[in-house]
Every structure is written in C-alpha cells, then in structure tokens.
C-alpha cells in the first residue's frame, strides 16, 4: 500500500537525502524561506491566497474553502495539476508540503489522485520541518566537538576547508567570503534559507560520524547572513586551529579571488565593458565600506592605488598593480585587526601550522583525543 502521509520522524531522512519537494505555498511565502530541494508549485498564487485569508478571518473556514475552490477551478485548476504532474514525471519520488501540512496538502493530494498520481505529503508541513531544522542548529554543538579554523586574510581557509570531510563551509552556505571584499556576484540567501541550508549541512555532517565539526572562525555576520546566536556562542568557546601561510602566497591568492575571479565573473555575466564597470564598482564600494575604520588618509591612499591598478588593467590588460593596494590593505587593515582579535583568544589556540601540517594534524586526530571534556 502506498504511503500518503510522511511522518515527522522522517524529517532527517528527507533532508539528508535531499528528497525532491513540491512546496504548495504561495510565492510570497516561498520567497521568505524554503528548502534547497524544493520547487514552488503553488496551489494558490499570492492574490488568491490573500483573498482566501481575508475571507477566513471575516467569514470562517468553510467560506474560505468555498472561495478557494471558486478561485482555483476549470482551466486554472488544470494548469496547477499539469505543473505538479510535469514535475512528478521528472521526480516521481517527490513529496508535497504546505505551511502546516493541512488543507492545501490534502486538497492537492486529492486532485493528483484523481489525475492518477498518488503523492505523499509531509506531516507538519513547512512549519514542522523548519522548527526541526532550528533544533538541529541548537543541539549540534552539544553533540560533537567543535574546532574553529583561524588564519590571516588570504591564508586559504576556505580552500583548506573544502578539502576536509569533517568541515562545514559556512561562507559557502552564506555565499559570501566573510571579509569586506567578500561579496559574490550572485546575492546571498535569505536569512531563513541560510539557516535551513546550515542545518541540512550539519545533519549530513552528523550522518558521516566525524570526530569533530570543523568551521571557519567567523564573525556573527557573514555578509548579511547572521549565525544563529546559540551556534555562534558555541563557536566562540571552541578551540582554535591557526592556518599559517607565506605573505607572497596570501597576496597572490587575494589577487586571484578579488581581481581575477571577480572580473571574470562580471564579464561573463554582463559583457566586457559593463562587466569591467561592475567589477570596478565592486572593488571601490568594498573599500568604501571600511572607510571609517581605515581613516581618511589611509582610505585615500588605498583608493588612489586601486584606481591606478584599475586603469592599468583597463588600458594594458595587466593586473599586477592590484598587488600594491592588496598589500596595503593587509598591512594597514586586515593583519593588525586579525592579530588583535587572535591575541584576545590566544588561550584557545590548539595548533598552528601550514596547509600540509594542518592536514596531517587533523588526519591524526581521533575521537578519543578530542573528547568534549578535553576541548572544554
């Protein structure tokens, strides 16, 4: 017999497996927050939902249901059913969900059954699954040891993390590199989507039973994405690994990240001329964002050097002069700030080393030597 209701006990399995999901909520609800494996194929669009909601408040549930049927009928109803069937043809194992796992899920399931498709819906809907994911974030720090990877700007922390199976890449989830120049071309996720994706990454990490959870030593805000407070507090108590890198390698890594990759990305998106203009604005606006912290004199020196580098790149197709302002940025801003912050938490430093030494240290790590007791 085909199951028509997926119980809340299967939330973990849904997210770990990346189960295809049909989100029946209106677009306005979906855009506030959803799940990575979901697609929005609403039962009612925004205006229809608004009318039904007003009717529910004024006349009650039965009147609202009747209005919903009158709004979504005939050709409109068939269009919605066809959209669901089209998705199910490509993803036959998909589940349905609405906000609470109530009327919208049940009605959609009924219409699909009449069309010849038996599709389960998720108990508790979006609200139940969202609350479950919040709980995952809150409880994870107590379930396994946390280690925080620190290192000067340009030391290659993200490059290192993505090579480690015990790591979760917070900046990748936030789509932001964490620094003043960390903005990417594509926008960051909504706060809710950031939290949902973080929780799912943590679930998958737990599934693999690693000896620890390795995270980058982040600020509370990664761009505009805020780490959940309890999770951030746990990170602030974690032992620290300091990734060390030679200055020339740091400079060239930042040249590649800030200049080569960003310029290429803007050009691919917008074309040569508009892409270069957008790239220039990205650099100049990033610098402007730290103007107060730099002070007027240092800001002007950096801006002038950056403008010269952009002019050389535009006229001679050379990027080497960008190293001048990147070097100034490290000397005048990033490095002093990092050294000050690390000094305050020096008592939490567990290990220092370059990429190779850090890999070897983590490879030799065992659950016994990294228990909650000797980390705390």
From Swiss-Prot:
PROSITE patterns: RHODANESE_3. The keyword Transferase applies. Residues 15-138 form the Rhodanese domain. Keywords: Selenium, Transferase. It comes from the Bacteria. InterPro entries: Rhodanese-like_dom, Rhodanese-like_dom_sf, SelU. Transmembrane segments: none annotated. It holds the Pfam family Rhodanese. Its EC number is 2.9.1.3. GO terms for molecular function: transferase activity, transferring alkyl or aryl (other than methyl) groups; tRNA 2-selenouridine synthase activity. SUPFAM superfamilies: Rhodanese/Cell cycle control phosphatase. It is an enzyme of class 2 (transferase). Monomer. Belongs to the SelU family. Involved in the post-transcriptional modification of the uridine at the wobble position (U34) of tRNA(Lys), tRNA(Glu) and tRNA(Gln). Catalyzes the conversion of 2-thiouridine (S2U-RNA) to 2-selenouridine (Se2U-RNA). Acts in a two-step process involving geranylation of 2-thiouridine (S2U) to S-geranyl-2-thiouridine (geS2U) and subsequent selenation of the latter derivative to 2-selenouridine (Se2U) in the tRNA chain. This is tRNA 2-selenouridine synthase. It comes from Shewanella oneidensis (strain ATCC 700550 / JCM 31522 / CIP 106686 / LMG 19005 / NCIMB 14063 / MR-1).
